[in-house]
Amino acid sequence: MAKKVKAIVKLQIPAGKANPAPPIGPALGQHGINIMGFCKEYNDRTASMAGTIVPAEITIYDDRSFTFITKTPPAADLLKKAAGVEAGSGTPSKSVVAVISKGQLREIASVKMKDLNAVNIEGAERIIEGTARSMGIKVE
């Protein structure tokens, strides 16, 4: 018989830098799981992706055991890295902070494809292009 799921917790944590301090400690501690065990396992899995934020979806069971899956970095972070900017525009409809090429857009869309609700790469590109537009990044 399958274990009964107690909770599903979603966190965005810098790769290889999980520690029991807030926000991770309180989010997981209230469900009674081994926080250090999670941090160690997460850091081992994400050590190769240092410098990026990697979302994790942690499934916590009634017997206080857990499993987790890591997702691809947020599209906004990938776009900022490709454009070479620290932050998006405060007024995206009026000011453009950077420009990225269609090739860079396709590369980001192919990385994010498995996490997006898109049928093909063109659909994924449109989703990522919308994110870029809302950040004040122009695609040419």
Curated annotation (Swiss-Prot):
Please give the SUPFAM superfamilies that the UniProt record associates with this protein.
Ribosomal L11/L12e N-terminal domain, Ribosomal protein L11, C-terminal domain
Q: Which GO terms describe its cellular component?
A: cytosolic large ribosomal subunit
**Name this polypeptide is given:** Large ribosomal subunit protein uL11
Return one Gene Ontology term, BP aspect: translation
Query: What CDD domains does the record tag this protein with?
Result: Ribosomal_L11
Q: What keywords would UniProt list here?
A: Methylation, Ribonucleoprotein, Ribosomal protein, RNA-binding, rRNA-binding
Family, according to the entry, reads as follows: Belongs to the universal ribosomal protein uL11 family.
Using the record, list the residue span of the signal peptide; answer none if the entry has no such feature: none
Q: Known HAMAP family for this protein?
A: Ribosomal_uL11
Give the record's subunit note: Part of the ribosomal stalk of the 50S ribosomal subunit. Interacts with L10 and the large rRNA to form the base of the stalk. L10 forms an elongated spine to which L12 dimers bind in a sequential fashion forming a multimeric L10(L12)X complex.
GO terms assigned for molecular function: large ribosomal subunit rRNA binding; structural constituent of ribosome
Q: InterPro entries, alphabetically?
A: Ribosomal_uL11 (IPR000911), Ribosomal_uL11_bac-typ (IPR006519), Ribosomal_uL11_C (IPR020783), Ribosomal_uL11_C_sf (IPR036769), Ribosomal_uL11_CS (IPR020785), Ribosomal_uL11_N (IPR020784), Ribosomal_uL11_N_sf (IPR036796)
Q: What does this protein do?
A: Forms part of the ribosomal stalk which helps the ribosome interact with GTP-bound translation factors.
**The keyword rRNA-binding appears for this protein:** yes
> Which superkingdom?
Bacteria
Q: Which PROSITE patterns match?
A: RIBOSOMAL_L11 (PS00359)
Record's comment on post-translational modification: One or more lysine residues are methylated.
